[in-house]
Amino acid sequence: MAHIELKNITKKFGGHTALTGLNLNIPDGEFFVLLGETGAGKTTTLRMIAGLEKPTEGQVFIDGVDVADWSAAERDVALVLQQYSLYPRYTVRQNLEFPLRPKIRRLPDAEIKDRVARAARTLRIEHLLDRKTDRLSGGEMQRVSIGRAIVRKPRVFLMDEPLSALDAKLREALRTELKNLQMQLGATFLFVTHDQIEAMSMGDKVGVLNHGRIVQTGTPQEIYNNPRDTYVASFVGSPPMNLQEATVDDGKIVFSGGQSLPLPGRFKAKVNAGDKVVFGLRPDDLYPVGHGLHSGDAADVHEIELPVTVTEPLGNETLVFAEFDRRDWVSRMLNPRPLRAGDRVAMSFDLSQAHLFSAETGKSLRA
């Protein structure tokens, strides 16, 4: 187990800057998820911690020691990749043993046997030990790949989108298994992904990375409920937050089509008349009347009638897309009732749950 800290990391590849002034602190034993779109710098960050890349500027600390000049082997970290990195001609047992053999670790045979048995038992792959890996399913191969990391007993587990090549059902199962494994081992995990469902369901903490910068870190609940800017609001959450540009005028939020809403009191000290803002509301906080519960003050509850553009039935709920100010707003409707495109539906929402962002900077104005 280990404490990881990155200080003011900048990484350049020729004229391209992959990371800019990145700071990251991962306590010992934490499951930390780095979430970002393709090209955000997630894998570059992982490779610098692993010792496969050196920062252009800044420092990498493991347990308080600057390891910038240490090789990957000296850092004692384990890397699990999207591609399984297994030897197809070897059995599962031989693949698990390989990192421990004389040329690598020089462990006694008894110790190797014990570590392999423990890893196989933990990952429930004991029945596969004598099978060659080219005869395994994708999920089984990924378990073996994780097992190769476990047998080493590394200080840190680094995981680069290990579930992205699996089908949806298997990804869901392995999300739970990986989280349980991390708690069982008590190890430090850094898991990178572009999938916000993986991030929110697995991480003790999540860091959102955008164009080489960490824009927000916090628990999944903190990031979902209090996004720091419009990027986080639109990226985290499925469906994402409804965002609509507006102008502040005479104590109201006025939209371009002429509709207006009262400006919530907590924002009044943060904006002036004429300010351009972005109004935000989660689909969970926008209900067809009679299909949701509002926990706030009744004075904050408002209703608007909107035309339905499309619906997405999901069984126990339906996503309703309805046009507001020339954009589709999304509502999550529980206890679904039949709705069709063109229907007009009364929508209810609680302004105490609304978000407001600066249109100029994208930063949250929420208290």
Where are the regions a protein language model picked out?
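Conserved ABC transporter NBD signature motif
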Residues: 58-66
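Glycine/charge-rich catalytic "coupling/switch" loops of P-loop NTPases
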Residues: 252, 257-309, 338-367
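The feature captures the beta-strand-to-loop junction immediately N-terminal to the Walker
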Residues: 35-37
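ABC ATPase nucleotide-binding domains
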Residues: 76-78, 82, 86-231
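Helix-to-loop junction immediately C-terminal to a conserved catalytic motif
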Residues: 50
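Conserved coupling/switch loops of ABC nucleotide-binding domains, chiefly the family-specific signature
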Residues: 56-59, 211, 354
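ABC ATPase nucleotide-binding domain
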Residues: 5, 25, 61, 346-348
